[in-house]
């Protein structure tokens, strides 16, 4: 199954779409898949000239890979410059995702970027280590207990020319490693067995269009761990340093 297949949602009534997913090694569904499909469902209700600029998702229940996912889109607001959407993903057990997404009409304006791309080995010098057949992922060696990590990633198959489809690809990939970083800084990580962890929420800000088949550097760090939860913040850079 390719990413384009995951994004090929079937219409089931007004602003309602149905998708499916593959089986994953850990069972259940992968959070990045649900977010990517939710974003695609939201985009179906928005004119193509409006681009996604942010999304905020909450994972409510564990997804079932053997059952279809129903994405219900609520048109919160259609403005001149911004469109706001809410997406609820449901299965037979109830809602598994609640997501807000905001789309903006492209406009000219000043641009500044203060964050600099960190140093990292070139992707060609690193070994592929992706669990997904959809992406080529190459992690930069690091000290796990530091709570910091880097990885290059790129989409392996064509996803089309629509900007939102490339944003969906980034959304899919972005949920991949933050949880591993949280587990790595846990003081009992050496003695813990049968650890089960899942994303509780996920937010992405999109600053510019991207091409998912190109290399991107994911630089992330754990900022807090406690109470059975952890917080990881990450930045994604294009090879030229654009954020």
Model-derived regions: residue spans:
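Terminal targeting signals and extreme-terminal segments of soluble enzymes
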Residues: 1-243
């Amino acid at each position: 199954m390719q990413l384009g297949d995951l994004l090929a949602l079937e219409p089931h009534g007004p602003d309602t779409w149905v998708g499916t997913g593959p089986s994953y090694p850990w069972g259940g569904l992968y959070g990045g898949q649900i977010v990517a499909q939710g974003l695609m469902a939201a985009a179906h209700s928005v004119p193509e000239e409006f681009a996604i600029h942010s999304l905020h998702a909450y994972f409510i229940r564990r997804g079932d890979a053997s059952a279809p996912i129903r994405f219900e889109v609520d048109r919160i607001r259609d403005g001149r410059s911004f469109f706001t959407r809410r997406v609820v993903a449901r299965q037979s057990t109830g809602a598994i995702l609640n997501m807000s997404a905001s789309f903006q009409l492209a406009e000219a304006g000043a641009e500044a970027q203060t964050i600099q791309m960190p140093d990292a080995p070139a992707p060609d010098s690193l070994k592929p280590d992706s669990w997904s057949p959809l992406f080529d992922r190459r992690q930069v060696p690091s000290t796990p207990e530091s709570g910091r990590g880097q990885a290059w990633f790129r989409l392996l198959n064509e996803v089309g020319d629509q900007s939102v489809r490339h944003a969906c690809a980034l959304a899919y990939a972005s949920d991949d490693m933050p949880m591993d970083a949280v587990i790595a800084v846990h003081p009992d990580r050496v003695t813990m067995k049968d650890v089960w962890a899942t994303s509780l929420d996920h937010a992405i800000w999109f600053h510019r269009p991207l091409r998912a088949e190109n290399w991107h550097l994911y630089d992330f760090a754990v900022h807090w761990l406690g109470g059975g939860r952890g917080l990881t913040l990450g930045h994604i850079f294009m090879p030229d340093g654009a954020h």
